[in-house]
């Protein structure tokens, strides 16, 4: 089992924690990670765009001028794609872009992402982080104590903490997630992975 240091919010190491091998020490499968990221980005798409073809644009049923004798190029409709206010060629229509990955693949991808953070020494465990007021400066102070003030960091908490979650929203490249919202895309997007000790236990309960 991999062992990682446990820090307090002052940046001092106060102990070590053993991580579950089946979650934090699995072989990295880049193909599965790629599938998970593609699915995540596809599922974020609304797919509500729509444009009209020449058949759907109002008007254009009459031939604008006779076929021959005017000296002008022949035209059949004022709603042809070459005309202003004409229809769109191969117009886009609303569609569902969502990709439903099998549960086993989703879980494996998450384990691979977490394992990659351990292997890269980018996983930081905090013993606790209690906030009872909205203080962005406090979040910046803690990140500075951990030597992460200029890093892209993902903070994972065991349950909702509105003060911490909203305080990090003002900091570019820092995001806070609950364990239930953990996803491969965010784990890979942020360089540093900060997780509270209680959140580690919760992850191991769910995915072990």
Swiss-Prot record:
The keyword Transit peptide does not apply. The keyword Iron does not apply. It holds the Pfam family Ribosomal_L4. The lineage of its organism: Bacteria, Bacillati, Bacillota, Bacillota incertae sedis, Caldicellulosiruptorales. One of the primary rRNA binding proteins, this protein initially binds near the 5'-end of the 23S rRNA. It is important during the early stages of 50S assembly. It makes multiple contacts with different domains of the 23S rRNA in the assembled 50S subunit and ribosome. Forms part of the polypeptide exit tunnel. One of its GO terms (biological process) is translation. One of its GO terms (molecular function) is structural constituent of ribosome. One of its GO terms (cellular component) is ribonucleoprotein complex. This is Large ribosomal subunit protein uL4. Residues 60-71 have a biased composition (Basic residues). Part of the 50S ribosomal subunit. Belongs to the universal ribosomal protein uL4 family. SUPFAM superfamilies: Ribosomal protein L4 (SSF52166). Keywords: Ribonucleoprotein, Ribosomal protein, RNA-binding, rRNA-binding. Residues 58-77 are annotated as: Disordered.
